[in-house]
Amino acid sequence: MSLMLDDQPPMEAQYAEEGPGPGIFRAEPGDQQHPISQAVCWRSMRRGCAVLGALGLLAGAGVGSWLLVLYLCPAASQPISGTLQDEEITLSCSEASAEEALLPALPKTVSFRINSEDFLLEAQVRDQPRWLLVCHEGWSPALGLQICWSLGHLRLTHHKGVNLTDIKLNSSQEFAQLSPRLGGFLEEAWQPRNNCTSGQVVSLRCSECGARPLASRIVGGQSVAPGRWPWQASVALGFRHTCGGSVLAPRWVVTAAHCMHSFRLARLSSWRVHAGLVSHSAVRPHQGALVERIIPHPLYSAQNHDYDVALLRLQTALNFSDTVGAVCLPAKEQHFPKGSRCWVSGWGHTHPSHTYSSDMLQDTVVPLFSTQLCNSSCVYSGALTPRMLCAGYLDGRADACQGDSGGPLVCPDGDTWRLVGVVSWGRGCAEPNHPGVYAKVAEFLDWIHDTAQDSLL
């Protein structure tokens, strides 16, 4: 199975056709428009034969030289193609930048995690290997929400102080105490302690995301079984699947801004979102959640698909189940290295020549590209912005296509799945040297949090 990419690329990345198209002819200045005499024609033929003979000798010498080059340097004549692991073959390409830009040094931050057994919040300070229980002193719901966001969750669902006398502690357990004068994520704000003055530690729960309850029952195949990607959504205009989307919360779905921009004149009441769907043939009239608001990123550019994300707020909340659930966002400062095996899914065209979407949900694995390689002259020649990332293969074996736009690119983080990209654009579908381009979700976390914060359920 091959998924293939939706929209045409930015103008800078499109093919440029050279010369007149088929069947187009023109007369150049100086062309003769009247008949030529036979004598002139014969003399012209003799001169032409002599010229052709000389050109033939030169051409023969050129072919011989080229064959010698092929024999001595066979690799030089091969087209640039291959998988991500063949990155060294692009060394002759002109890179968009000689080296990756160095980021300014950021203040060291504290790391958090939530114990899955008792939901106690733990912190790691100053690169110490030990995880410390967080004292309840100085705690606030606002800090709890910030921590949930930093872990890739969209909302805070529960928090409280737990008495130390109610939990089992080993004798070596240490604690982290927050200084009320400093920010909650700066390392200097947290001090290791042997005990908590209040006698309480923090219990924290965030919205559930990134889990696949039915994953253990799925075996092989490229047509997707129910529950394999529970956050996959179908964004439909009327009864027609238009784009993919990803469920972030019961009333929030993220998709591509260009999907909404292409149909910006459509009535809001015509949009519906289907979740837990595998086959479109199973959809019945009036099914799906109506869209209450469409919120494209305010900086979206229709010219180069920069900032290509949009949020959809639903009129009614989705009912989460084994087949419907939310995907996690990337954690704070989380980095997925090039070569990471991620998955893209959707109902898009399964072949470049097809003009219809797939009835069954499809998926395929794609490795992440380095932005430097994707912006090289061999691939997209600098068309990518910092809000974009690449995933796929240089040999074009698998990709996304029309109808997949807005859908999820997810990467595993242990047992948790995180939304790393939103299907955005590419050159053609599964073309060699042109992998898929995705909106980089990590660049939009603040906007997603700020937009969804006031009206989450």
Curated annotation (Swiss-Prot):
GO cellular component, one term: plasma membrane
Organism field: Homo sapiens
Sequence similarity: Belongs to the peptidase S1 family.
Associated pathology: Defects in TMPRSS5 may be a cause of deafness.
Residue span of region Disordered: 1-21
Entry's localization field: Cell membrane
InterPro entries: Peptidase_S1_PA, Peptidase_S1_PA_chymotrypsin, Peptidase_S1A, SRCR, SRCR-like_dom_sf, Trypsin_dom, TRYPSIN_HIS, TRYPSIN_SER
Official protein name in the record: Transmembrane protease serine 5
Main localization of the protein described in the UniProt heading: membrane
GO biological process: proteolysis
